[in-house]
């Protein structure tokens, strides 16, 4: 995707920034109990895990995770742990490289699901939230998965036309 490490870092930071502000903007339209979270950044992670085999990608995602923790959560350790570990897990599946667009869409949905669940478990473990799991699933996880599946489908349709899948 982007072979230059500095351009890749800037692209990842811009994607993370767009995600944060898009999430905040979308939450203005809903009731305060609904929390919609945009994860275009995770789509980029899956796409780069598939096409960029460089080891420096781990360091880039650790740096972006650290900056995302400071900017979004104001606590270090949540996304700086999850981003490189998700990249590692994605690279451990050799069949992941041979997927068609529908399978890639399902991988993006699974990554979104596991990221949200892992983030909730870590936040609950560190006592950053007292939000019950049932409310988390109903008011945050389900709307976020629906929104991110729609966005991922649009992005995959655009990329599949570009890559002639």
What are these regions (language model features)?
Residues 1-165:
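Terminal, non-globular segments
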